[in-house]
Amino acid sequence: GSQIWLEPGEQLTLDEMLKAICISSANDAAVAVAEFIGGSEPVFVERMNARAKELGMQSTTFRNACGLDEDGHLSTARDVAIMSREMLLNHPEIENYCTVWMDTLRGGATQLVNTNKLLKSYNGITGLKTGTTGKAGVCISASASRDDLRLIAVVLGSSSGKERFAAATSLLDYGFAMFESALVPIPADAPKTLPVQKGEEPALELCYTAPERCLAVKGQGSTLQAEVELPQTLEAPIREGSVIGSLNIKNSQGILQSCPIIAAKPVDVRSFSGCFRRVVNALWLTA
């Protein structure tokens, strides 16, 4: 596999290691970073698998930190897309590495060249990573952004780099031709709170988890509607983060996406002292 030929005891910054990994697929750099963070590669791989499970990567099992063929080291296009989405959404600095065409290390002695040719040919490309092994074939997770629409195209098992890039280009072209990014039309009168029975607080503050924008068929974004589903009242206790209802994003054919509405804060069951205080306050107000 690709490497930068790290020497025992050699020191590089994490920034330099990430350049080597993201630009030129340096497997030795990936293992070195795994050992630095996890203490050993196997421990780091355990963390990789735990994180994959958290993200919902149901068909992925990592056996090493660099992606080379190994018994039981498996993934799918769907899972690679989930992982890519997580990187782009919550670690956007990755684009600073994956969009670099050429760079150097060791004072210019080591040249890094990106194998993602879409960086030079595709409008709006933002990364992400190529990869090739004997079992997986020639692969890519390609990401691109145009007019607030961000897409990820994952291609596995190609027979050549040319086939890989052609397939990724076709997928991205299809996505940009058929879909658009639309504002989620949250109703202006959507409830901010709900009354709570038997609670220390009379009302629960609601948190809407709906994204600012969502995917829509091109030309239909302005026709989207949002419908709020909530109970009339709640009963304590209520834990912070509990799902209270949903905001359903709809088009003419039905629900496109259902986004949870959750409790922004906990509400405990009203204590005796709380009940007594409310009675006293009520009597004071009516006196």
Question: What spans do the regions from the language model cover?
Answer:
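Domain-terminus/edge residues, biased toward the C-terminal soluble/receptor-binding domains
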Residues: 57-58, 69-74, 78-287
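Active-site-adjacent loops and short helices of periplasmic peptidoglycan-processing enzymes
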Residues: 1-91
